């Protein structure tokens, strides 16, 4: 039986026009399975996960394995109303592959296709992960014990598309590639009353304003200026009527840090300042902070050094050392469990990630596939 090579651009466009949100990627999962089952099956073992039904694991048996190498691709889309005007634009209003996960899946399928036809020396595990954008799919997968026995990787790799690099350029750095993130939700409760009689009430607008200014001292005065830390309070609300003193106020924000130590420091100071505000204003301040799986993506020093050296040494690969990004990625959770590396694939787009007009250059797909295949072959040649 002759098996036709994959039409990767066509597959990417199928993913793009049928985006699905986190934990709802059922059509995406079905298309992935269909493509994978069209490949030669003699080296492949496909594993589905009842506890995480849109996730998918595929194992490629190595010829003389010294290790098992994991490769992860995320599969979910974003709640963005696409405005690219492409012929293959999203057919689902309000949902779009605006973060390049359609590219990530397609690159992974291209790598998988190659090794399904050319047996690798080491075992390979391809993890198609749901719910990267929200709900921490990496945590859910790990907690479902999917990485066990022959599906347990010794090391993990993954890429993320970036419009800041030309199509096909690989970017990476030693240390942290993505910041860790924490959602911050604060609720202040006091005593409402008539605007004419403030002495009989406990105004939460005043307490809220004080708390906001105090929280902004954390990065200014508690964080080392040469280290990466951010606390942004992006949403506030209080009151309903101009002449009624508000009995409640809400603040929502996000913490970003390049190390987990930094994130924990900011979390601790948020808690302390909220407790102080509650005492100072004789009110209640409810503090909820959720990091989920969005730990800093801290690349393994040895594996990252090897990847950078290889990418720089191959004249067919264009490589650039990149600064850390303050955006989040839940691959950081997997790197807290397995050594590994994440790197960038340039897609040369003119619009930013998460933009309604994000339109990656499809030439990046094959260039990314070729670079990763070469790196994995080189990595496998090293032995144990």
UniProtKB/Swiss-Prot annotation:
Keywords of the record: Amino-acid biosynthesis, Diaminopimelate biosynthesis, Hydrolase, Lysine biosynthesis
MF-aspect GO terms: N-acetyldiaminopimelate deacetylase activity
GO biological process: diaminopimelate biosynthetic process; lysine biosynthetic process via diaminopimelate
Active site: 74, 133
One Pfam family this sequence matches: M20_dimer
Known pathway: Amino-acid biosynthesis; L-lysine biosynthesis via DAP pathway; LL-2,6-diaminopimelate from (S)-tetrahydrodipicolinate (acetylase route): step 3/3
Matching InterPro entries: AcetylDAP_deacetylase, Amidohydrolase, Bact_exopeptidase_dim_dom, Peptidase_M20, Peptidase_M20_dimer
Enzyme superclass (EC): hydrolase
Catalytic activity, reaction form: N-acetyl-(2S,6S)-2,6-diaminopimelate + H2O = (2S,6S)-2,6-diaminopimelate + acetate
EC number(s) on file: 3.5.1.47
Superkingdom of source: Bacteria
Extent of the signal sequence: none
HAMAP family referenced in this protein's UniProt entry, alphabetically: DapEL
Entry function: Catalyzes the conversion of N-acetyl-diaminopimelate to diaminopimelate and acetate.
Family from the record: Belongs to the peptidase M20A family. N-acetyldiaminopimelate deacetylase subfamily.
Name this protein carries in UniProt: N-acetyldiaminopimelate deacetylase
Organism annotation: Pediococcus pentosaceus (strain ATCC 25745 / CCUG 21536 / LMG 10740 / 183-1w)
